[in-house]
């Protein structure tokens, strides 16, 4: 369960970083 939460957090961080990067461009 803990590893699943960490994986979800990492996915959210990655997608938010990707969105910010796209907005900057």
Swiss-Prot record:
Residue ranges of domain H15 in the record: 1-25
GO molecular function: DNA binding
Keyword hit for GTP-binding: no
Sequence segments annotated as region (Disordered): 1-25
Protein origin, superkingdom: Eukaryota
Function noted in UniProt: Histones H1 are necessary for the condensation of nucleosome chains into higher-order structures.
Protein name: Histone H1.1
Source organism (scientific name): Triticum aestivum (Wheat)
